[in-house]
């Protein structure tokens, strides 16, 4: 099984590499490798990120480091996750795509049904995602009856390479059109990345399950009802699986009950790398 991480410095600025994101990346790969040593782990990155990883001395954690092949002229400040789709567009085998802040604490592969697609969780996106009546969405060359049910892609298992490439290429095409239409914010990114994936899974009659069997309400910004099409409800998932996502902002700012020093201490204890030198990193 091939497992993929993608890390691109879209700002082309070494100063944006921070300590929290660094230890999360290390924890993500180390925990996965500990629990799934039989898998092939590949990191795709740009040249600046490669130098950053070299300075940290952590490139050995992956089985292979590959260069991201940019295919589209996109507004990367809005479509900052486009490199994940560019990587997926080149895959010729079943893959798992891991976000760099997704931690899998225990073995999980034995729970994955290999003929089904898996996402992190299902999202209820009414009032949050751009709709079919959005003036930019209306101008897309790809026409669909857009529903507001979406998926979170911080963990993806994609068993069908043909479907994976079709999804990734269409997503990139939509991002390119949105760029030409001057899409103003990253709501259009998640439309092209997450809402599109849910739409295509339904269109192609693909079976899909989630890791977390609790709906996320995007508008209310809270977890909702549980369902029976996943591995664990949110309250049970935390000892097995965690995606930090927007939580990172609160940790860095010591807000909403989060504490940066406490979280860093726990993560550093998790990765067990006393030789790690992050003194050159300027940001939390």
Name the predicted role of every residue range.
Residues 1-72, 247-284:
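N-terminal anchoring/stem segment of glycosyltransferases
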Residues 9-12, 48-51, 102-104, 124-127, ...:
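Short, solvent-exposed loop/turn segments at secondary-structure junctions
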Residues 22-26, 81-85, 102, 190-195:
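Conserved glycosyltransferase catalytic-site signature
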Residues 40-47, 94-99, 118-119:
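Short, hydrophobic beta-strand segments that form beta-sheet elements in well-ordered domains
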Residues 69-98, 105-106:
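A conserved donor-nucleotide-binding helix/loop in the catalytic core
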Residues 104-141:
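Conserved donor-nucleotide/metal-binding helix-loop-beta segment in metal-dependent transferases, i.e.
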Residues 148-247:
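Catalytic core and acceptor-binding pocket of nucleotide-sugar-dependent glycosyltransferases
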